[in-house]
Amino acid sequence: MFDAKNFLANVTHQPGVYRMFDEKGQVIYVGKAKDLKKRLSSYFRTNLNSKKTSALVSHIHSIETTITASETEALLLEHNYIKAFQPRYNVLLRDDKSYPYILLTKERHPRITSHRGSKKVQGEYFGPYPHAGAVRETLSLLQKLFPIRQCENSVYNNRSRPCLQYQIGRCSGPCIDGLVSDEEYQQQVDFARLFLQGKDQQVLEHLIKKMEQASMQLNFEQAAYFRDQIQAIRAVIEKQFVSNERLDDMDILAIAYQLGIACVQVLFIRQGKVLGNRSYFPKVPANTDLSELTETFVGQFYLQGHQGRIIPSTIIVDHVLNEKHELEVLLTEQAGRKVNIQDNVKGNKSKFLHLAQMNAQAALVTQLKQANLIQERYQALQELLSLTTIKRMECFDISHTMGEQTIASCVVFDTEGPLKSDYRRFNISGITAGDDYAAMEQALLKRYDRPLENEKIPDIIFIDGGKGQLNRALQVFAQLNVSWDKNKPILIGVAKGVDRKAGLETLIISKQNKEVNLLPDSLALHLIQHIRDESHYHAIGGHRKKRQQAFTQSGLEAIEGVGAKRRQALLKYLGGMQGVKNATLAEISSVPGISAALAERIYETLRSE
């Protein structure tokens, strides 16, 4: 039992972070305090008024502290520890992904495109948008309003005639000399920039002036073009929910909680417009106060900077935060400008908060229905396999085209469904083309022939395939020389039916040494189909990406003496890679910058492929 009295006697009154461990040495809770001794002493009072705290204290085996220079530093360190250790008594934000942005590049003829990840590309970033669909929708709209190129530079630099986008009026064709002047193109770029900044009226004023000037100069064709552009923009503005009140960029957070599941709804407002919303379902320990949940979510959401997330000027929440000031100080420091957290709002801000609350409640209802269905499916699978619990399942699939660009996928489900942060893909190499057995063996070795923490050992491993695939998997596990319990997982082959129809699968269960055909309406089968299909799509996605990379590589990169400029010249003068491959030696020699010796090397290399 933990000796609290002896431990507290040596704890400092300085600010810092504490980590609580259970008897297995696992971190079960991370907290911060401006006075470590005072805060830690509060856990060991005789009259604890929180069930959550009582449960936590009963599992404490040891405590470690880290002294910090300030409360602000303690707050940041706390969230770093939560991210690193994922303690079960802390609120945890699951599977957060980086947000997509719209990027306007900094080039002679800027292109407009979507971007996710670190902001290494020079240009202006607009967003964040809640999901990729919102970015695609906005890009499609921009293409209709402003004829700016969206093509990759590799395409733009090698055009010899305008593409289809030019033909249908969605690009002004800056890739071809004479179609649009630099000034005219830049003007459309400026309009798009203003539009993305929410300055729609400025765009309209400029366009109206342009239309009037063109009309006065009797250039009626250009005047009609500007008129159509004005009408299109007005039609878009009428559909958008725009506040008349001048609003800074802000995020609005609302929480709905029921039956142990919490939904945090984040509503993104930029220049008074709703960019979109996104629902989060963090892991919440039982009996967690909603103010604590809000506080922890704000810290994790904005202070874990790997997502490339921009901190807005204003964050509106629907619960009072005990550490509002400390969070504001830290967020201001991170953002490099003043950040306000507001919990008592009026006017349009109140309307936006109400909108977020309605969305949170609606998303929670949907999630509860889904969670109940998942639990029913897990229960059915447990009964089928005579298991008391299933905490983790993994499923493998192989994807290739005629044995080329082989990819293996591993997807992971926990008790809440897909655990996408643990998904993995494996490049398969050094095997006979099309040998799925060898591919599966290589994937399993890459996954399991290494140390595993107890919670990472799956209860079930599904192999998408019949007896042959399953037998190869069993051979791999028999040969594993690892410290973890390799006999724990049940290996199950999922063989497709005669007509490869869903619902006709045969399950080959290794430990029970039997084959099972479940009814099409079986909840256990539905769960197996879900994880199998998820693995299949994950494998296909990786394979397609790898195949596309192989397809788009020109084949010129590996030829000595062919750098970027010569490669560009070859593609431009000979009409793309197919033209280069079909060109005669004389045609290759005629390309500027290509000597006779280099032309011969290119010709021979491409012929030998």
Curated annotation (Swiss-Prot):
Tell me a GO biological process for this protein. SOS response
Which SMART domains does the entry mention?
A: GIYc, HhH1
Enumerate the spans annotated as UVR domain: 201-236
Q: Which domain of life is it from?
A: Bacteria
Keywords (A to Z) from UniProt: Cytoplasm, DNA damage, DNA excision, DNA repair, Excision nuclease, SOS response
Q: Which Pfam families does the record associate with it?
A: GIY-YIG, HHH_5, UVR, UvrC_RNaseH, UvrC_RNaseH_dom
Any one GO CC term of this protein is: excinuclease repair complex
Q: Where in the cell is it found?
A: Cytoplasm
Q: Domain GIY-YIG spans what residues? A: 13-91
A GO MF annotation of the entry reads:
excinuclease ABC activity
> Which InterPro entries does the UniProt entry name for this protein?
GIY-YIG_endonuc (IPR000305), GIY-YIG_endonuc_sf (IPR035901), GIY-YIG_UvrC_Cho (IPR047296), Hlx-hairpin-Hlx_DNA-bd_motif (IPR003583), RuvA_2-like (IPR010994), UVR_dom (IPR001943), UVR_dom_sf (IPR036876), UvrABC_protein_C (IPR050066)
Q: How does it assemble?
A: Interacts with UvrB in an incision complex.
- Its job: The UvrABC repair system catalyzes the recognition and processing of DNA lesions. UvrC both incises the 5' and 3' sides of the lesion. The N-terminal half is responsible for the 3' incision and the C-terminal half is responsible for the 5' incision.
What protein family does this chain belong to?
Belongs to the UvrC family.
Matching PANTHER family, A to Z? UVRABC SYSTEM PROTEIN C, UVRC/OXIDOREDUCTASE
Matching entries from HAMAP family are given as: UvrC
Could you tell me what this protein is called?
UvrABC system protein C
Identify the species of origin.
Histophilus somni (strain 129Pt) (Haemophilus somnus)
Q: Which gene encodes it?
A: uvrC
